[in-house]
Regions:
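Bacterial N-terminal signal peptides
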Residues: 7-16
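Right-handed parallel beta-helix/beta-solenoid
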Residues: 17-48, 52, 65
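Extended beta-solenoid/beta-helix repeat architectures
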Residues: 54, 74-78, 306
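Positively charged n-region of N-terminal signal peptides that target proteins for export
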Residues: 1-4
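Right-handed parallel beta-helix/beta-spiral solenoid domain characteristic of secreted/periplasmic
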Residues: 34-36, 40-44, 58-63, 69, ...
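Glycine- and acidic/polar-rich repeat regions and solenoidal domains
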Residues: 71, 88-103, 116-310
Length: 310
């Protein structure tokens, strides 16, 4: 099959990976209930909104800073969005269930326009968002200076989509926490996002069965100490397309991308690297590390800057 045709097919799959679901059940469902949150509103905190919201709700949060305002979301259909500007969620020592600023354990949930920062918990595994159940879309959010940016449970039915977001300076510093850590879930899609300056951990780590990493910037930056820029420790199917991936001269690990180093656990284990720019400033840096046993490894039309080959 011609190389150009393979690339078109891969890009088409990347755009269409998530199955289309009916937004609401058949019949005549009630209109969503809109709950407005803010210091001048009847519902003043997100914690209060989480308790009163039903299974079909839109939460609109007034712009501003919300300190120690943590919540658990269990609704089946939920939209959380900032209104009138950014909403800054500062942990300030608080956490929901000892896990995160937000624990999301519901159905179809979307989050847009929030800045998550400062999460610290006794287990040293705190997150801006702990995602434990359902299908979650995160759009136009930032995750800065948490122990993990987003951390998921290990559930084979979870689906996580991230769009146009930023992850930086997350990590406990022990190499066990990361900017983004997707566990053994069904699907991960990340597009248009910026990952940088993980504290010893990875910029992006995923154990998902299927991964679409498309049109992102994963660069550790000046003074960065991240380990891998991109790791799939258990393989799976990974489409890595159109990204800029680069490491720092102060990195903790000379490898940019790693695949299958903890053993292959999924029925299919395939890596596709198309149209990326890979930057390695180190004399002994390694662009790609793949453990033996992968079903397929394909690399086309990547730009390599610095030392190293594919």
């Amino acid at each position: 099959m011609p190389r150009w045709l393979i690339q078109i097919l891969v890009m088409s799959v990347c755009l269409l990976w998530m199955p289309v679901r009916a937004a609401v059940p058949l019949g005549e469902p009630a209109a969503p209930v809109v709950i407005k949150v803010g210091p001048e509103r009847a519902v003043k905190t997100l914690a209060a909104a989480a308790k009163v919201a039903g299974n079909r709700a839109i939460i609109e949060v007034d712009a501003g800073e919300y300190v120690a305002d943590v919540a658990v979301w269990t609704q089946e259909q939920l939209v959380l969005r900032a209104a009138g500007g950014r909403v800054r969620l500062v942990a300030a020592g608080a956490s929901a269930e000892g896990k995160a600023i937000w624990v999301i354990r519901g159905g179809q949930v979307s989050v847009e326009g929030f800045d998550f920062s400062g999460t610290r918990v006794p287990s040293k595994n705190g997150a801006g968002i702990r995602f434990e159940k359902g299908q979650l879309t995160v759009r136009d959010c930032t995750f800065i200076n948490n122990e993990n940016g987003i951390l998921t449970a290990n559930r084979p039915d979870l689906e996580l989509r991230i769009e146009n977001s930023e992850f930086g300076f997350n990590g406990q510093g022990d190499g066990q926490s990361h900017n983004l850590y997707a566990g053994a879930i069904a699907h991960l899609s990340v597009s248009g996002s910026y990952f940088h300056h993980a504290k010893v951990g990875h910029l992006l780590k995923s154990r998902a069965a299927v991964n679409y990493i498309v049109n992102n910037r994963l660069t550790d930056g000046v003074g960065g100490t991240a380990s891998y820029e991109l790791e799939f420790p258990n393989g799976g199917v990974a489409y890595v397309v159109g990204n800029v991936i680069g490491q720092s001269t102060t990195t903790e690990n000379p490898h940019l991308i790693s695949f299958g180093v903890e053993g292959y656990t999924w029925p299919r284990n395939e890596l596709y690297l198309f149209n990326n720019t890979l930057f390695n400033p180190l004399p002994d840096g390694v662009l790609l590390r793949v453990s033996p046993g992968a079903d397929a490894v394909k690399s086309f039309d990547n730009v390599l800057v610095g030392r190293g080959t594919l």
